[in-house]
Structures are given as structure tokens and as C-alpha cells.
Amino acid sequence: MSAVAVFILFAICLVIAIPVSISLGIVAVLPGAFDPSFTASASYVIRSMLGGIDSFPLLAVPMFVLAGILMAHGKISQKLFDVFVYLIGKRTTGIPCAVIITCLFYGAISGSAPATVAAVGSMTIPLLIELGYKKDFATAIVAVAGGLGVIIPPSIPFIMYAMATGESVSDLFLAGVIPGLMIGALLMFYAYYHCRRYGEDKEKIDKKVTELREKGFLNILKESIWALISPVIVLGCIYAGIASPTEAAVISVFYALFVSLFIYKSIRVKEIWGIMVEAMKTYAPILFILAASTAFSRVLTLMQVPQTVSAWILAHFSNEIVLLIIINIFLLIVGMVMDTTPAILILSPILLPIVQSIGMNPIHFGVVMIVNLAIGFVTPPIGVNLFVASSLTDVPVMHIAKKAMPMIGYFLLALLLLTFIPAISLFLL
């Protein structure tokens, strides 16, 4: 069975709405079913699936999922937002910028874009609307800024990329810091332009910030400090050599539980089981996709698909700039129609040999790949962030996407800079 037939069948399965994990399992088994002499028999595929999820680094994923849900229920995003509003709320575009900075910080806790949108958006979008910002703008800015959750470390997609390629999770986390901050700064620049052009209700904003400032900075800082230092604790443990990324993920769970239960008292003991069930429901589909993607990628390797694709592309595109642009366009399209996890696990083994052949650093490519797929979070038809944000405000998905287009433009500008200036990603390594 040819590789082309495998991918066509996979596309058909997706079009007729067969779940991604089942689709991957089907196409992983078929080559061996059609050719009994092929190494990848059904038993091989099953062993590959079990082997794919039997990974210590992979344990970080459910832990970060659980930590993110604990922090969402624990109102930690509210504490982060309050301190940023206190500091910059009265400035032009101060409130939207506070939303973006909150997404940056929350992304450094949860490692997930949809979780960032849900946690930050549920609290900030109603406030933005109350302060006079249009509902579609408020929804769009949270949906796009939520994409920073997969770029700023710790990042679940970076863990997936490390699993698929064997690269260092810690190095990938470091490489995501400057790109995440740069994209956040570009989004704030757009928010400033938007607010200068369309105006703000300064009277409402000043009243709201004044109410907050009446508490006093020390009181606000006292309430927020536990939320502010959480990324420092998680990332500090990793880079100080105290803990591996997986161990740091476990630390983040216990830290979130401790702060929410005993400091902020925003969750009760009897709610913990429900939170764990929610985390399991969130992670279970990811686990099945991980297992099936691993088996499928190993079958593709046995079929020599990475080598064949690499040889064909390098034979037809000798110019490095053109090649990188084509890969970026391809990844952008993939991000629009496929979830991040299977995209990373399937495409990384295929594309990495190609970019390495032109001298591109694997860590640098990992950042470029994740930024491409982060844009997919806010582009139809899949656009998970769009659907999460839409569920918070009832604004139609396409309206949010239309309002998000200028911000996506800044995301694309950042992508070009990251692609052709490797030092942005590799500076901290």
C-alpha cells in the first residue's frame, strides 16, 4: 500500500468525521493488512501505541492539564489580572494590554492555549464589555492572546515535539521565552493602535481602576504574589536543576492546589474530585491521539516516507528561503484543519530531516512549528480558541475570526522574524 493512499484514506476519515485517534489507528494498521510481508502488523501497531505512551516525560502533560484546571477553578487568573490593571489600567489601551499580559503569565502556568482562553476569558471578557469595548474585539483579543499559552513555557506542544524528535524539553522551553514575549509585545502594539483609532471609555475605565487602587498596591500585591511567583517556581525548578519538566509539572499541581485551597480558599476539598475528573476527561482524548500518532509515525518510518518526502522536496526546491516559506505555509494550513498533537507527532519526523539538511537547528524548527500551529488555534475551521471564546460570549466563530485577522497578521510577522532570525529563538540557549 503506497504512502499516498495512506494519506488519502486518512484525509477521508477526517472528512467523514471519524475521530482523529481512530483515523490514525485505521491507517496505521492498513499497510500491514494489505501486505502480510510488511513489518507493521496489527500486533506491531498495538505495541507501538503502548510504547508511545509509556514515557516518563509524557507524564508532564496530564500534570500541566490538571494544574491549569486547578488554577482556573482557583481564580488565580483574577489575581494576575488585578495587579496588571492596577499598574497600567489607566494608560491608553491599559486594560487590553493587561489582558494580554495575563494570558502570558497564565500560559506560563497552564501550558495550554484553550485553557488560557477559558480561564482568562471567562473573567476578563465581561469586564472589557462592561468598560465599553466591543464584544467582538474583547473576544478576539483573548482568543488570539490565548495562543501564547503554547509558546511561553511550560508548553504542552513543546513536550510533544520533544517526544517526537528526541530534543531536550528544557531547551525547547527556553527557546520559547523570547518568541512568546515578542508576540505578546506585537499584540499589545496592535491593541494600542486599535484603541487610539476607535477610542476608549476613559470615564468607565478610570472609575474601575480607581476602585481597584483604593485597596492599595501592597494589598493587591499581597493577594497576587502567590499567582505571580507560580511561573517562577515551575520554571526555576527546571533551570536550577532541581526538577525535570515532569517533576516540575507535579510541583505545579501541588502548588496550585495549596494556593487555591489554603491561601485564596477559592476551592473546597469536596470540589477536588470533580476537578480531577475534568482533567481526566480533558487528557483522555489527548492520550488516545498520542498512542495512535506514535504508531502511525513509526509505520510511516518503516514505509520510508520521511526519506522519500525529504528527497523529493530537496530535489525540487533548492533555495533555502523558498523552502522555509513553503514549509511555513504547509504548517499554517495543517494548523487550520488538524489538532496540534497529531500534527506535531506525525509531521515532526517528516519535516525535521528536511530542515536539518539545510542547516536549521532542531530547537529553532520546533519553535517555528509551534508558532505556526498556534496560529491554527485562531483560524477556522478548527480554531479551538475561537470555539472556546465563542462559548463564553455567544459571538459567532466567524465574527471572532474576522476581528482577529489584524492580530493574526502580527502573529505572521513574528513567524517570519522567527523563521529567518534563528537568534531570537536560540539566544537563551
For the regions a protein language model found, what residue spans apply to each?
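Alpha-helical transmembrane segments of multi-pass membrane transport proteins
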Residues: 1-429
